[in-house]
A protein has these predicted regions:
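Functionally critical mobile loop/hinge segments
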Residues: 4-106
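Glycine-rich phosphate/ribose-binding loops and adjacent secondary-structure elements
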Residues: 1
Length: 106
């Protein structure tokens, strides 16, 4: 949504705004939520900082590539939902998988 807000602030048209949101969201599909020691510092807060930079890049891409787009924002949202449903429960903010598991193993 940050990408869409930035695109709007930059005066892009509605198609470019939607495309900015689509680009930003599609590059976050399938991310695990595996907080180390049950805290949100790693990886969540760091991930938000990276996502903010990605939002800026998404706006720039949407400005120049919107006429070539193939996937809609709605398709990305539906895919994110399906991906989340398919994801193993241990990667859903439980600290039982991913980075959290590696940290406790060391």
């Amino acid at each position: 949504m940050t990408a869409a807000a930035l695109a709007s602030l930059y005066g892009l048209n509605i198609d470019q705004i939607e495309y900015a949101a689509e680009i930003a969201m599609e590059h976050n599909l399938g991310l695990t939520c595996d907080p180390v020691k049950g805290l949100v510092q790693i990886p969540c807060i760091e991930r938000n900082a990276v996502a903010a930079m990605r939002a800026i890049s998404s706006v720039n891409l949407s400005r120049f590539l919107f006429s070539t787009r193939k996937i809609s924002f709605d398709e990305v949202v539906a895919t994110m939902y399906r991906t989340g449903k398919d994801m193993d429960e241990k990667y859903r903010e439980t600290s039982h998988g991913g980075l959290a598991q590696i940290y406790y193993a060391n």
